[in-house]
Amino acid sequence: MKVQFALVSALVSLATATAVAAPSSAVMAKIVSQGVPTDALDRMVRFLDENHGRSFQQSTYDCAKWPDSIRPCDDSERRPSTSVVTLEYPELVSIIDFTQPSTSRRFFLINLKSGDVIRYYVAHGKGSGSSNYATKFSNIKDSKQTSLGFYLAGGIYSGSYGRTMRMYGLQPSNDQAYNRDIVLHGAWYVGEDFINSKNPKTGQPFGRLGVSWGCPALSLAMASKVIPQLQQGSVILHYHKDLMEAAMTGNEVSVNEPSRKK
C-alpha cells in the first residue's frame, strides 16, 4: 500500500524593494525603439497591471538532505511541497524573444522607470531545437524544452555554472518550472566565441549558441551581473510571437524554423 505524504506548505514572499507605477507612453515608445517587440512589451505591462499584489500557488519540492535550500536535488530525494509567491510591480523586467535566433541578443533587460534597455545573448533548451532557432516549447518534465510565459524571479544559489537564480512559472504554460529546475544561469556555450568556434563534427563554425536543458542561459560574465539585479521579484517573459496562446495548455507547441535567406 502506497503512502501519500501531505504537501508541505511554505510561504515565499518575493517583492522588489521599491514597486513602481506603470510606464508612461513616452517610456513605452523609448523601450520599443530599442528593439523590444511591441506585442511582448504590451503583454508584460498588461500582466503586471492585472496581477500586481496577487499571490500564486506553486508546486515545488523540498530536498531531504537540505530542506531549507533552494538547490536542486535528485528526484529520489525530493518531497513534494507547495509555495506561495507574490508579484509586485518591479522596476526591472526581462523579455526573451524566442522568435529571434540565438545569434541575436534576444534577452532584453528593461528598466520600466527610465526606459533603458540592455540586450544579451541567451540560449534555449536542447529539446526546443539544436539549431539557431527554438521551434518547440512545452511545460513537460524531462523534455529539455523551453517554456513560454511569465516567471517571477526567486532566490539565488550556487549551481554547476556558479550563481544561479530560481524562477517560478506563473501560468499553465510554465507552472512546472520549479519541479523542472528551470533556472537562470550562466554557461560557457553562450557568447560570440562559441558562435564562431568550429563544430568538430563539421569543421565549420557553429553559427549558433549552445543549448541548455531547458533553462535560459546567459554568458557566465553577464549572468554574474544580471542575476543579482533580477533576484527576488523581477518578472521575466519567455515570448514567441506565434505561440503564446497555444502554449497555455502546457503541451508541446511548435513552429517551422524560418527559411534561410538565399
PLM-predicted stretches and their roles:
Residues M1-Q4:
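Positively charged n-region of N-terminal signal peptides that target proteins for export
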Residues A6-A15:
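Bacterial N-terminal signal peptides
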Residues A21-W213, A221-Q229, S234, H238-K262:
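Cell wall/extracellular polymer interaction/catalysis modules
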Residues L218:
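A conserved hydrophobic position in a structured secondary element of the catalytic/binding core
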